[in-house]
Amino acid sequence: LLKSKENFISPEVQTQNNKKIRFNETLPSIDNSILDGHFETARALEIAAAGKHNFLLVGPPGCGKTLLSTTLIPALTPNMTEEESNVNYRIKSLAGLTGPHQDKYTAPFRMPHQTASIEGMCGGGVNCRPGEISLATNGTLFLDETAEFRSSVLQMLRVPLESKSVTLSRAGRSTVYPANFQLGLATNPCPCGNFHSESRVCLCSAKSIEQYWNKFSAPLLDRVEIKHFVKKDTEDTRKITVDEMKSHIETAIKIQRERGVYNSKLNPLEIAELCKLNKTCQKYMDTITQKNDLSPRNVANILKVSLTIANMDGREKIRINDLKEANELCSNVFEKPNQYKYNFESSIENDENEVQEPIRLYSAKYQKELS
């Protein structure tokens, strides 16, 4: 199994035209009441699961970020394909984690402790065993209380998030393991946890808050598409159920598996081909790109998330509301534009009659700066 990279690295997603999308049926049923007042957070996690996008949830202690993440993501992540399952089985075999009663197709949800070392996360040791990032392949690596992890561990994630693999070297031998995972982060907004709280006073200085967030680094946060501040809004009457979210995700995953690649894994050329915009959408992207000084990676994140939103609605074409919601989700968690609120009626807005054009201005930058 260790002879070559090809023993592990397989196509991003097995093309499936007729196979039904299934979810983990062994989990206990979820009480939809936990979503009351958390429509925005549920929507963010729904989109993250539908496109396998990396996500960051920020909020004060007790706001529900960990509960919602650990409850919804395992329930909303579709089961693996046969090919994905085979890759995971090989990894688990080398880690000594296989057993006769394990569900072969359930996507992994790994939640390492905050004291995890680089070796524990990346893998290594005498026999070059796979680490958490490899064990989470085709599933989710969730880091609760992210700020408590060592800075070196967090920075180590940057390369695997790009390459989808990790190379371990020991005693003159190199071993390549896959590390194709969805990254989920959850953290307090500051050391005391009350920054941006509407009901509590933050006791942290500006310097301590800056030092707190320096641990994450801009390059790491740039690789996280969805960023959301969690707070319970008792006045928000919008409702959504887990079954409705699964239906939306099933629609999106089917489109992506037929295409052969998940939206979060699209490369610059694929983004330019799939994310064709009409004049209204192009003008909107031009405006926010210039106004917010967006980098090519920021633009790519918005386009990938907007494509996922369109796919959840059964569409391949991106509409203006898809871009607005994606821009809201991809913005800095403390600098949200707060100009768009998703509702089922506004998502029906029809601008499909306009001619779709390949994205301009951005594709050349993608190829140069993201390749």
Summary of predicted features, one role per range:
Residues 55-97:
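Walker A/P-loop
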Residues 138, 144-146, 156:
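Walker B catalytic acidic pair
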Residues 59-60, 123, 145:
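The Walker A (P-loop) glycine that initiates the GxxxxGKT/S ATP-binding motif of P-loop NTPases
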Residues 127-128, 151-340:
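Basic, amphipathic alpha-helical bundle interface domains used for macromolecular binding and assembly
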Residues 46, 108, 119-141, 174:
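Conserved alpha-helical scaffold flanking the Walker A/P-loop in AAA+ ATPase domains
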Residues 1-50, 54-55, 63, 67, ...:
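Peripheral, non-AAA+ core regions of ATP-driven protein-machinery
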Residues 102-120:
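Inter-Walker segment of RecA-like/P-loop motor cores
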Residues 57, 80-83, 95-100, 129, ...:
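Active-site phosphate-binding and catalytic loops of NTP-dependent enzymes
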